[in-house]
Amino acid sequence: MAKLKYKVEADPKNTARAMGRTLRISRKHAIELCRELSGMKLDAAVAYLNRVIALETPVPFKVHNKDLPHRKGKIGTHSGRFPQKASLEILNVLDNAKKNAEQKGLNTEKLRIKHISSNRGFTIKRYMPRAFGRASPKNQETIHIQVILEEFY
């Protein structure tokens, strides 16, 4: 597997970072969640993701919103979804970054998400046998998530 670099250079003294690789989640859900979480405080982001998993707060879909139903509540836009699987995976990556910050001696109460992004991973290629000796591709896309947490003052 190729070495994957972080998109943003950060000062290692007051930042902690983590990466989730080869996650089997939707690329579109990951893009919308990363856009929504960017710049949030870590505690607020974890609470937000837990509310999304519990189907209480929808994630506004601003780019990939074709044929999406409207959701009640103030979410910024009218259309949104509850990407539970992607929220759980991103929550695991954020927890890993928080533990890395604890290991470095940073104050976990004063952490905010400086950078979060989703990148396309490799495609797991499979084939489904069909009638009359044919086969159809059944591919699974994977996603890489990068998180950099910064201690603010």
UniProtKB/Swiss-Prot annotation:
<comment type="function">
    <text>This protein binds specifically to 23S rRNA. It makes multiple contacts with different domains of the 23S rRNA in the assembled 50S subunit and ribosome.</text>
</comment>
<dbReference type="GO" id="GO:0022625">
    <property type="term" value="C:cytosolic large ribosomal subunit"/>
</dbReference>
<dbReference type="GO" id="GO:0019843">
    <property type="term" value="F:rRNA binding"/>
</dbReference>
<dbReference type="InterPro" id="IPR036394">
    <property type="entry name" value="Ribosomal_uL22_sf"/>
</dbReference>
<keyword id="KW-0694">RNA-binding</keyword>
<dbReference type="InterPro" id="IPR018260">
    <property type="entry name" value="Ribosomal_uL22_CS"/>
</dbReference>
<protein>
    <recommendedName>
        <fullName>Large ribosomal subunit protein uL22</fullName>
    </recommendedName>
</protein>
<keyword id="KW-0689">Ribosomal protein</keyword>
<comment type="similarity">
    <text>Belongs to the universal ribosomal protein uL22 family.</text>
</comment>
<comment type="function">
    <text>The globular domain of the protein is located near the polypeptide exit tunnel on the outside of the subunit, while an extended beta-hairpin is found that lines the wall of the exit tunnel in the center of the 70S ribosome.</text>
</comment>
<dbReference type="GO" id="GO:0002181">
    <property type="term" value="P:cytoplasmic translation"/>
</dbReference>
<dbReference type="GO" id="GO:0003735">
    <property type="term" value="F:structural constituent of ribosome"/>
</dbReference>
<keyword id="KW-0687">Ribonucleoprotein</keyword>
<comment type="subunit">
    <text>Part of the 50S ribosomal subunit.</text>
</comment>
<dbReference type="Pfam" id="PF00237">
    <property type="entry name" value="Ribosomal_L22"/>
</dbReference>
<dbReference type="InterPro" id="IPR001063">
    <property type="entry name" value="Ribosomal_uL22"/>
</dbReference>
<keyword id="KW-0699">rRNA-binding</keyword>
<dbReference type="InterPro" id="IPR005721">
    <property type="entry name" value="Ribosomal_uL22_euk/arc"/>
</dbReference>
